[in-house]
């Protein structure tokens, strides 16, 4: 019997939370459920043959200019592209450390080329859809993903303390700076409150006896399991109101609401298009006094906290789940004009993705290219530069090995869940907590 499932080639720039959560996990689930045949790979391992074998090409986030040939291959072979972008990469600010490479002219040009060529562009922000519609006629806003299997039941609280969390993936955190002064005043007035700052470090708060600092956890699954287990009462989500940040997703609302945490959010379009003020969260203007007042209010009113937590969690259950995420991906895949294909033999149903030979050949080409560069670089720049560049490439190979391991881990997790081996999903609702 012919295998008519669409073949999807998903090409990631690297493994980081948004590419794993938004692209890799849902597509691996669809592959395991036998709705698609997935080849999941990285940009520098992609070959023309892999593109030719696909019915649909999925790209996400940024496109390294040296791999822009992927767009050429897709165009020449008539392969449709679905492009997912969860940040406004056309408006990268110069005051956020580590993002300067995204603003390089060649990378910006590659981004625009991808937007113009893509058959479907997926975003998580209405503001970003409006902006990117200047480059593509088919930009859709989708609900953010959430992996409920990562939920853990928090321990019963008996100390009567109100716990607040501010969590961010930014170690150098300019956004959270707006909270430092109001939080300092709130903590001084409320000795029964404990604040956890997770991921960032704000020295003005770290010396306060009611503040706990936790380091950034780079593996998102590990982070979210620990986060859900903590049983925080109040979550803070500040956000700047500028062009770049208006393109963000409502990730903190998803995290806080799903964990039964009463969230306090900046009153900006990222949040006020999904958070209902005083029902599923509090929306706050970005000034010191407003933040101080809102945090104090939710500390002092346990009924408000409880109501926000319960309604927020119900909203998250309905709108942020695997069924919604996977259906949106399947709709996009089925909506594009795929090339006509002769009947194919059914693919083996296993966790492994097709195209392993192509990946091995891609790695071999990569290593061969490096070997050919050693002598010219040695002549022109000397031993020191050769050693530096060699070390960079060794690190790259380490990342490749880590990629293979992580992909297998994702596949095993999804296989176990689909086979019923992971046990029931924890339900850490507000009933696990004492009221304050």
How would you describe each model-predicted region?
Residues 1-65:
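N-terminal pre-catalytic "stem/leader" segment of glycosyltransferase-like enzymes
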Residues 10, 14-32, 145-153, 157-230:
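Conserved catalytic-core segment of nucleotide-activated headgroup transferases in glycan assembly
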Residues 89, 101-120:
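Membrane-proximal helix-turn-helix segments that form the acceptor-binding/catalytic region
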Residues 317-318, 323-425, 429, 436:
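C-terminal amphipathic helix plus adjacent low-complexity
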Residues 220-221, 225-258, 264-275:
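Nucleotide-sugar-dependent
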Residues 116-152:
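Donor nucleotide-sugar binding/catalytic pocket of nucleotide-sugar-dependent glycosyltransferases
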Residues 297, 304-319, 331, 348:
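A short, well-ordered alpha-helix in the C-terminal region of glycosyltransferases
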Residues 277-278, 282-289, 297-303:
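Conserved acidic donor-binding segment of nucleotide-sugar-dependent glycosyltransferases
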């Amino acid at each position: 019997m012919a295998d008519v499932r669409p073949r999807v080639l998903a090409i990631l720039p690297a493994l980081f939370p948004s590419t794993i959560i938004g692209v890799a996990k849902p597509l691996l689930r669809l592959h395991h459920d036998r709705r698609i045949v997935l080849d999941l790979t990285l940009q520098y391992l992609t070959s023309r043959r892999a593109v030719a074998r696909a019915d649909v090409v999925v790209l996400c986030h940024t496109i390294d200019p040296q791999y822009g040939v992927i767009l050429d291959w897709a165009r020449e072979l008539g392969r449709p592209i679905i492009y997912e972008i969860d940040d406004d990469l056309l408006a990268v600010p110069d005051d956020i450390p580590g993002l300067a490479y995204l603003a390089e002219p060649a990378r910006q040009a590659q981004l625009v080329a991808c937007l113009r060529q893509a058959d479907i562009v997926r975003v998580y922000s209405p503001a970003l859809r409006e902006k990117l519609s200047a480059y593509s006629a088919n930009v859709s806003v989708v609900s953010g993903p959430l992996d409920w299997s990562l939920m853990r039941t928090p321990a019963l609280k008996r100390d009567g303390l109100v716990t607040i969390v501010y969590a961010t993936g930014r170690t150098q955190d300019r956004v959270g700076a707006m909270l430092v002064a109001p939080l300092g005043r709130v903590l001084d007035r409320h000795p029964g409150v404990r604040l956890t700052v997770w991921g960032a470090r704000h020295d003005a708060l770290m010396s306060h006896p009611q503040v706990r600092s936790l380091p950034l956890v780079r593996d998102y699954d590990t982070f979210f399991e620990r986060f859900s287990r903590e049983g925080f009462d109040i979550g803070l989500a500040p956000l700047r109101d500028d062009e770049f940040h208006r393109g963000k997703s409502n990730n903190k609302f998803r995290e806080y609401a799903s964990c039964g945490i009463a969230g306090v959010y900046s009153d900006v379009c990222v949040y006020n298009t999904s958070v209902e003020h005083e029902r599923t969260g509090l929306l706050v203007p970005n000034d010191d006094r407003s933040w101080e007042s809102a945090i104090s209010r939710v500390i002092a009113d346990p009924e408000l906290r409880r109501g926000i937590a319960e309604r927020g969690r119900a909203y998250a259950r309905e709108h942020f789940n695997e069924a919604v995420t996977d259906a949106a991906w399947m709709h996009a895949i089925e909506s594009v004009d795929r090339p006509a294909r002769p009947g194919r033999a059914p693919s083996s149903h296993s966790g492994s993705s097709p195209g392993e030979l192509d990946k091995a050949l891609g790695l071999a080409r990569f290593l061969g290219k490096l070997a050919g560069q050693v002598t010219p670089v040695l002549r022109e720049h000397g031993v020191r530069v050769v050693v530096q560049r060699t070390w960079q490439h060794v690190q790259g190979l380490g990342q490749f090995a880590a990629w293979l391991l992580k992909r297998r881990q994702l596949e095993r997790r999804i296989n176990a869940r689909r086979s019923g081996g992971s046990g029931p999903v924890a339900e850490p609702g507000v009933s696990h907590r004492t009221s304050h």
